[in-house]
């Protein structure tokens, strides 16, 4: 994903282009003098910090942001796994919610690794998420294009939220959750109906909803990891390590929200207690390490 500033008629535009395949050989062709000058100007404009949400693109600010976010990621991960373990001890793993969600995710993993990947569907969702958050930030989308090889949108606003939102917002999972919630307001989705499979003799639409959410979350997770390892340029634009910390923290918070909503024995209060306990342990460990280091140096 690359971010490029394009100046037209004294109005600044931002292009988010998404590459799924190998770079085109045209990129290696030597450009004319005027084109080279324009390319240099674009690189200069790209280095400017723009937008109210945009993190200043200096090494100092990126380092400070990373130092703040890294322990937050560790603490949130510890709290999530502690709550997940507590829910498993409370027999959450026996519930239909857990099994159908995991079944959907496992079936998606089989599709992702064994069959042809629906790249076009992912790219469309990726660019649509950029567009959605552009509108949320009171911006405008001037161009939207999607192909199997990649896609791009051109907007008049750019910030950290717009640039990284596709990596931590599972668009299709959110759409499915909203649809099932809306239908559930008028129809009882918990009613079980006879099914032709012996392993699941009776199914409800709620169970199928959990299955679909599991597949949609697996879709988001696998494609997010698949694209990140391809070294996306917009991660570099915001600082790769800093961007990865933002993505990891946001996804952990979404997983924690999902666990709290699905597991009846876990509440926000429980998650908060686990989070504060993990933070105290991390702080105590860091303080002890600093005291030990000071004694060794002194």
PLM segments and residue spans:
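N-terminal targeting leaders characterized by basic, low-complexity, disordered sequences
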Residues: 1-26
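Metalloprotease/metallohydrolase-associated module, dominated by Zn2+-dependent proteases
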Residues: 21, 28-94, 98, 146-293, ...
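Canonical hydrophobic alpha-helical transmembrane segment
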Residues: 97-108
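Short pre-active-site segment immediately N-terminal to the catalytic Zn-binding motif
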Residues: 108-125, 152, 156-160
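Active-site recognition of the HExxH zinc-binding catalytic motif
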Residues: 122-135
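M16/MPP (pitrilysin/insulinase) zinc-metallopeptidase core fold and M16-derived inactive scaffolds
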Residues: 140-145
């Amino acid at each position: 994903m690359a971010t490029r500033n394009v100046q037209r008629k004294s109005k600044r535009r931002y292009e988010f282009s998404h590459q799924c395949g190998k770079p085109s050989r045209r990129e290696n062709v030597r450009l004319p003098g005027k084109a080279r000058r324009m390319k240099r100007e674009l690189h200069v404009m790209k280095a400017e910090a723009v937008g109210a949400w945009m993190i200043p693109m200096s090494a100092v600010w990126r380092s400070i942001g990373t130092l703040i976010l890294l322990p937050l990621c560790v603490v949130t991960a510890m709290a999530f796994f502690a709550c997940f373990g507590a829910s498993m001890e409370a027999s959450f793993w026996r519930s239909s919610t857990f099994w159908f969600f995991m079944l959907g995710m496992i079936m998606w993993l089989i599709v992702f690794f064994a069959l042809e990947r629906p790249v076009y569907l992912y790219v469309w969702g990726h660019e649509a998420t950029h567009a959605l958050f552009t509108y949320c930030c009171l911006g405008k989308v001037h161009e939207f294009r999607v192909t199997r090889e990649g896609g791009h949108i051109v907007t008049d606003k750019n910030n950290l939220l717009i640039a990284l939102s596709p990596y931590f917002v599972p668009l299709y999972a959110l759409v499915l959750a909203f649809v099932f919630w809306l239908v559930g307001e008028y129809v009882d989705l918990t009613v079980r109906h006879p099914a032709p499979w012996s392993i699941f003799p009776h199914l409800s639409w709620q169970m199928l909803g959990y299955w679909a959410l599991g597949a949609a979350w697996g879709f988001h997770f696998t494609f997010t990891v698949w694209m990140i390892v391809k070294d996306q340029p917009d991660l570099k634009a915001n600082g790769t390590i800093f961007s990865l910390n933002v993505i990891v923290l946001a996804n952990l918070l979404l997983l924690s929200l999902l666990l709290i909503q699905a597991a009846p024995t876990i509440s926000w209060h429980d998650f908060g207690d686990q989070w504060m306990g993990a933070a105290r342990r991390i702080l105590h460990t860091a303080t002890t390490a600093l005291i030990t280091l000071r004694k060794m140096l002194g």
